[in-house]
């Protein structure tokens, strides 16, 4: 039986009548925008913003990008402003 969770992973093996549990904790990586030399979140930087937008044009959630909540809000606002100013497209076209 295999159970997995976002923060930890539990593996259960059946050995005879007893079950043995092994718990593996994956260390969560920190926010890529909170490190020392991180780029500044700005609507005028579409190269940075496009990394946090999916192929369909939707903003990626923080559980996928590992961005902290504070930076995720700043990213969302910057992406919205960049779209309004036509620096980023609202919908990406399939090629």
Swiss-Prot record:
It holds the Pfam family Ribosomal_S18. GO terms for molecular function: small ribosomal subunit rRNA binding; structural constituent of ribosome. One of its GO terms (biological process) is translation. GO terms for cellular component: cytosolic small ribosomal subunit. The keyword Transmembrane does not apply. InterPro entries: Ribosomal_bS18, Ribosomal_bS18_CS, Ribosomal_bS18_sf. Keywords: Ribonucleoprotein, Ribosomal protein, RNA-binding, rRNA-binding. Disulfide bonds: none annotated. Belongs to the bacterial ribosomal protein bS18 family. Part of the 30S ribosomal subunit. Forms a tight heterodimer with protein bS6. Binds as a heterodimer with protein bS6 to the central domain of the 16S rRNA, where it helps stabilize the platform of the 30S subunit. This is Small ribosomal subunit protein bS18.
């Amino acid at each position: 039986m295999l159970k997995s969770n976002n923060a930890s992973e539990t593996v259960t093996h059946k050995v005879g009548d007893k079950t043995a549990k092994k718990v593996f904790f994956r260390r969560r990586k920190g926010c890529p925008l909170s490190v020392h030399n991180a780029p500044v979140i700005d609507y005028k930087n579409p190269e940075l913003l496009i990394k946090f937008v999916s192929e369909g044009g939707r903003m990626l959630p923080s559980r996928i990008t590992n961005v902290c909540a504070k930076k995720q809000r700043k990213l969302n606002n910057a992406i919205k402003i960049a779209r309004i100013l036509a620096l980023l497209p609202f919908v990406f076209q399939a090629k």
